[in-house]
Amino acid sequence: MTDSKSSYTQEWRMAAYLEAEWSDFLFGSSKIDDTSFDPLVSHVHPSFYQEIASLTKQCLEEKGILPQRYLDIGGSTGRTVYEMYHCLSSLNEIVLVEPSSKFCEWSRKLLLKSDDLGYVPVVCTPQKPDYAKPLNRPKPLQKSPAELIYIYEAFAESVPRPREYFDLITCLNVLDRHPNPKSLIQILHNLLTPSGVVVFASPMDSDDTYTPDRSQWISNLNSLFEDRFWDAVADTNVFYEFRYSNRKFTRFSSQVVVKQKR
């Protein structure tokens, strides 16, 4: 997975993720419909993360679960954690793991610090991003060194917590960047408490770079979760948008499943 890690160091990719996850804060973007979208001036909106948080809260309430220990695998620059923090008041420990050092650096800046962000990379040409001062930034989730939020540069296989530790895990749009999807599901199962909940999403945009064994490519997330180990809670689809350059806009449809460990 070293190649996967190194590919997430380029500044153009950083610009794309910052926009996809934080454009409402950094650039003041609002959700717009397709008819008014202009890729030269418009930003994609992070509605994906807000919809995931809303779905998670609804499912947990229906199950009568008040999660305390929460893990986000492949947490990128931290928007999922931000939404869960504000959505789930019962949380008392949050762990984000992300293999990219650059993404971890930005998640710490955006989630834990109140410093000026300086110039941030902005989506521009395929060769390189532009740079601009953001209009705003999110308020930090903690203002003191309270031991609530931990951010680790790590893969899912190296989460520094014991088995059956977390009662809520999110793993969003990571599957098609993992060499062995079935082993990833086993990792989630090991880390979850009995009756713990996982929110798992993927557009299943697999390719040979990240998952060279094509027998591991899937078309439905439910095929990874065996009924003898998991109960189905929800199954839906949520749009996930990216702007890789100012003329390359991509919309994925991520399948989102919510499962409860038996």
Range-by-range predicted roles:
Residues 43-66:
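Conserved alpha-helix/loop element of class I SAM-dependent methyltransferases that forms part
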Residues 67-76:
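Conserved class I S-adenosyl-L-methionine
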Residues 77-89:
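Conserved SAM-binding loop of SAM-dependent methyltransferases across substrates and taxa
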Residues 100:
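Conserved SAM/SAH-binding beta-strand->alpha-helix loop
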Residues 112-157:
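S-adenosyl-L-methionine
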Residues 157-169:
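A short acidic, Gly/Pro-enriched loop at the edge of an enzyme's catalytic core
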Residues 182-194:
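A short glycine-rich, Lys/Arg-flanked "PGG" loop and its adjoining helix->strand segment in the class I
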